[in-house]
Amino acid sequence: MRKGALKDPEIADLFFKDDPEELFIDLHEIGHGSFGAVYFATNAHTNEVVAVKKMSYSGKQTHEKWQDILKEVKFLQQLKHPNTIEYKGCYLKEHTAWLVMEYCLGSASDLLEVHKKPLQEVEIAAITHGALQGLAYLHFHSLIHRDIKAGNILLTEPGQVKLADFGSASMASPANSFVGTPYWMAPEVILAMDEGQYDGKVDIWSLGITCIELAERKPPLFNMNAMSALYHIAQNDSPTLQSREWTDSFRRFVDYCLHKIPQERPAAVELLRHDFIRRERPPKVLIDLIQRTKDAVRELDNLQYRKMKKILFQETRNGPLNESQEEEEDGEQGSNLNREVDSLGSIHSIPSTSVSTGSRSSSVNSMQEVMDESSSELVMMQEDEGTANSSASTVHKKDHVFVRDEAGHGDPRPEPRPTQSVQSRALHYRNRERFATIKSASLVTRQIHEHEQENELREQMSGYKRMRRQHQKQLIALENKLKAEMDEHRLKLQKEVETHANNSSIELEKLAKKQVATIEKEAKVAAADEKKFQQQILAQQKKDLTTFLESQKKQYKICKEKIKEEMNEDHSTPKKEKQERISKHKENLQHTQAEEEAHLLTQQRLYYDRNCRFFKRKIMIKRHEVEQQNIREELNKKRTQKEMEHAMLIRHDESTRELEYRQLHTLQKLRMDLIRLQHQTELENQLEYNKRRERELHRKHVMELRQQPKNLKAMEMQIKKQFQDTCKVQTKQYKALKNHQLEVTPKNEHKAILKTLKDEQTRKLAILAEQYEQSINEMMASQALRLDEAQEAECQALRLQLQQEMELLNAYQSKIKMQTEAQHERELQKLEQRVSLRRAHLEQKIEEELAALQKERSERIKTLLERQERETETFDMESLRMGFGNLVTLDFPKEDYR
């Protein structure tokens, strides 16, 4: 997707559809930085005064710039607090985002720039109080500013403190990005990629540094290279207030903010209860400070205006300056400029390493505007001196201090000439709208100039920031990749465990079904065997009964025949009596046989019942044996499955352990590679910085050497002038002496006296000339020696400074390397402990599961045996009640089918 195409509805809703160039008019540049430029503007529809921050998202790092714009817009939309800048909207125009906010007079840093001295303690407390209220609001919503400094703490006309510039802000806490401005960075931000995450406490550190900045006009380590300052902050003690004039309350507040350990650093809400913030102060302290600053800015701009008007007046009246006048004027302006730069020391020129978008497009050069506008006033002054003076006084007739031409519409202008067009521009200058500010015109001009001059340093810092950001992305990408790999590995192992559990469950179900089928089959076989056994006994008993009945019939016949024979032999017994005796005998025999048959049937029934009962008992015992065999088979199967599961878990643990060690090694290797690359880049940056400083010093020395002949010539001319003055004095003295001698000596001696005086004058002039030559030679030698010594001293001081910075870098890198190695060792130990603990838990789990399985085995077998024993006892008791004795020793009959 092309950046700015706004195809995503959610992104499109972030921007207004109006044309910003038509909506906002009278744009005047009021600030410049790495992101681009900030303009004063007026809403053409509502006449509301606003500030417009233009951010280009074209060129290099387009995607990053666009994402940063989206992040800042989303961040600003969330803010609703009196101590944060009010967001008005955002517009897009030709790959440039117009971020519109409420207009503020300037920043706390501008106060230092204008007054050229630290703020008073009550003023610092008032500014800090407002900033803390804004930070408390941000931190409550888990937001981090990450670029707190005096330049980002703005002031409004009523004296309201506003936090601004959220280009570095984070919408998540904790965070771990390397962002901010070097001198104000907290140690944990510098070490973010190496040691982990940070939270809103980084803003508290930056606020403490800002307090020192307001109290000493610049932050600690400001005279140091920005990169070296990072190394210094990361490994040295926290800075403190240097001067003893500050109160103990202020000192404690700063020390409280600058605790090295983030956990010991207070939160914003805690600092709001600090006595430094809560103590009484004048209610209008900030309003009075703003008014004094506006008055001072008015005077500065008036002074600059008068200087430019004087220069242009001289050029118009006298033409170009001659060489000597030009050199003198250049020297004066150069010394003034050097004094101004040395005294002010622009803090805004420090490039912020926050994610920001750079816009190289800006308005016309403000100095050119001042020159053009001054020339216009000059034309009017030539026409009417009184009008010119009046115009000069009305340039700053209100609190509106300085003026900028409309941004983006400046064209190269011709040399100032008293023409009609110049007069019209002068009229435009007089009638153009002014606006209130606490930032002088020269400060804005210097910011633009320094922004252009320090492009190399800014690019170096930006490149370093991009490298750290890229390294962080690489680490996050690798961590995500390793996490995905570990998740996939664990999912695979989990599936394997689930598959094993499912297979085990299926096997147990199959075994249970098999055992049920076996039991049912055995029951059917037992029922068939019992039926067959009963039928066999009944058949045998039927056969025995038949045999017994046949035997009785035979015996009955024999007895009958025997009785008949006995009766036939007995002839004495009457026939009737014989018949009766035979009948009675038959009846007795039949009765006996009937009793014997009944007894046999009873015995057979008892035998049948007893043997059937015994057979049932045998079937029951056999069923018990089958149940015991089944439960042992099931328990053995479970044990085998559990052992296989445990072996699989051990294998999984070992494979996970190998993967964890391999991933840790991969992550640590990448981290060390990135640190080596970072250290190499830092070293290259430092060497490049050293070379640049040496080149600048060499260039300065070359310029001094080139300038030395002019300086020597001027000094030689001064000595020559002294010599000429001395010669004139001696000539006058010679004339006076000659006249006196001629008056007091006879006329005939005049010739000799004149010759003597002439020789004496010649001798003295020769001595004077020799002294002159000697003075010139000594002066040249001393100046050359002095220049050589000064340059050598500067070279020595620079070498010492660069050596100290290099040693600081080496110490920082050694510390980072040692900390990283210690971190790696801790990670390895932590992993070893985790692996060891996990293995111990696994072994304990295996032991517990085996013990539980053994307990289950014992309990189930015990339960089964007890149940079977109760069942056997119940069966035997019932057998006893049925009249059967001990069935255990009962033998089957020989004809038993078994």
From Swiss-Prot:
Which GO terms fall under molecular function for this chain's record?
A: ATP binding; protein serine kinase activity; protein serine/threonine kinase activity
Something else the entry says is: Contributes to the development of house dust mite-induced asthma and may prove to be a useful target for asthma therapy.
- Keyword Transmembrane helix on entry: no
- The keyword Plastid appears for this protein: no
Q: What happens when the gene is disrupted?
A: Lack of marginal zone B cells. Reduced naive CD4+ T cell abundance in spleen, lymph nodes and bone marrow. Reduced protein levels of PTPN6/SHP1 in CD4+ T cells with no difference in transcript abundance. Increased phosphorylation of LCK at 'Tyr-505'. Lack of ESAM+ CD4+ type 2 conventional dendritic cells in the spleen and impaired CD4+ T cell immune responses. Impaired osteoblast differentiation and aberrant skeletal mineralization with mice displaying enlarged fontanelles, delayed closure of the sagittal suture, occipital hypomineralization and low bone mass in long bones.
As for PTM, the annotation reads: Autophosphorylated. Phosphorylation at Ser-324 by ATM following DNA damage is required for activation of the p38/MAPK14 stress-activated MAPK cascade. Phosphorylated at Ser-324 and on Tyr residues during T cell activation. Phosphorylated by LRRK2.
Q: What is this protein called?
A: Serine/threonine-protein kinase TAO3
Which family is annotated?
Belongs to the protein kinase superfamily. STE Ser/Thr protein kinase family. STE20 subfamily.
- Subcellular location(s) of the protein: Cytoplasm; Cell membrane; Membrane raft; Lipid droplet
What gene is this protein translated from?
Taok3
- Which of this chain's residues are annotated to bind ATP? 30-38, 53
The reaction(s) annotated as catalysed by this protein in its Swiss-Prot or TrEMBL entry are:
L-seryl-[protein] + ATP = O-phospho-L-seryl-[protein] + ADP + H(+); L-threonyl-[protein] + ATP = O-phospho-L-threonyl-[protein] + ADP + H(+)
The biased composition feature labelled Basic and acidic residues covers: 405-416
Q: Coiled-coil ranges per the record?
A: 452-502, 548-649, 754-871
EC number, UniProt record: 2.7.11.1
Q: Spell out the catalytic residues.
A: 147
- The chain residues annotated with the modification N6-acetyllysine are 830
Origin species? Mus musculus
PROSITE patterns, A to Z: PROTEIN_KINASE_ATP, PROTEIN_KINASE_DOM, PROTEIN_KINASE_ST
Q: Which membrane topology term applies here?
A: Peripheral membrane protein
The record ties this protein, via InterPro entries, to: Kinase-like_dom_sf, Prot_kinase_dom, Protein_kinase_ATP_BS, Ser/Thr_kinase_AS, TAO_STE20_kinase
